[in-house]
């Protein structure tokens, strides 16, 4: 992973791939934004990447997964979806099993993606540039 350019800010985040019983991938759109992304967010002081992912998953969509049960998928540098002149350094996990999601107040909308269908054009760069190509190889 190469570092961002000096003219860009860098945000560290954790995110989680969550699937429903039809094999669709959960994406969320946060209030005041226009791109869909994984559930996830920034760490609290002292949190590991997995602890952050677990906490954010519970806060955003009501899914409780023990951090130890999250499986690392990868870490990437990507353009931030909703913040200008900003990159994200994202650690992405996969949650075991299948889930139902219930959006919290900070989530404007959830959408389940059928990975075998044509994908919408309002997805975050982390998804389109890194995660979805990796999932397509599996």
Language model segments and positions:
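Conserved N-terminal beta-strand and adjoining loop/helix that marks the start
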Residues: 2-25, 42
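Short connector loops at helix/strand junctions that flank enzyme active sites
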Residues: 11, 38, 65-67, 85-90
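Conserved hydrophobic "DFG−1" position in protein kinase catalytic cores
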Residues: 18-19, 27, 94-95, 112
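Conserved Nudix-box catalytic region and its N-terminal flanking loop in Nudix hydrolases
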Residues: 20, 24-60, 64
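Nudix hydrolase/Nudix homology domain
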Residues: 31-36, 103-138
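A short coil-to-beta-strand element that immediately follows conserved catalytic motifs
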Residues: 64-74
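Active-site-adjacent beta-strand/loop module that shapes the phosphate/pyrophosphate-binding cleft
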Residues: 76-102, 115, 134
């Amino acid at each position: 992973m190469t570092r961002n350019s000096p003219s860009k800010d860098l945000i560290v985040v954790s995110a989680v791939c969550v699937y429903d019983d039809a094999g669709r991938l959960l994406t969320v759109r946060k209030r005041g934004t226009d791109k869909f992304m994984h559930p996830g967010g920034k760490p609290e002081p002292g949190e590991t990447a997995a602890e952050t992912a677990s906490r954010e998953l519970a806060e955003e969509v009501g899914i409780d997964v023990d951090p130890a049960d999250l499986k690392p998928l990868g870490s990437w540098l990507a353009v931030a979806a909703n913040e200008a002149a900003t990159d994200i350094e994202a650690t992405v996990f996969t949650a075991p099993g299948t889930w139902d999601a219930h959006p919290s107040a900070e989530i404007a909308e959830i959408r389940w993606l059928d990975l075998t269908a044509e994908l919408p054009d309002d997805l975050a760069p982390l998804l389109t540039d890194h995660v979805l190509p990796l999932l397509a190889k599996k």
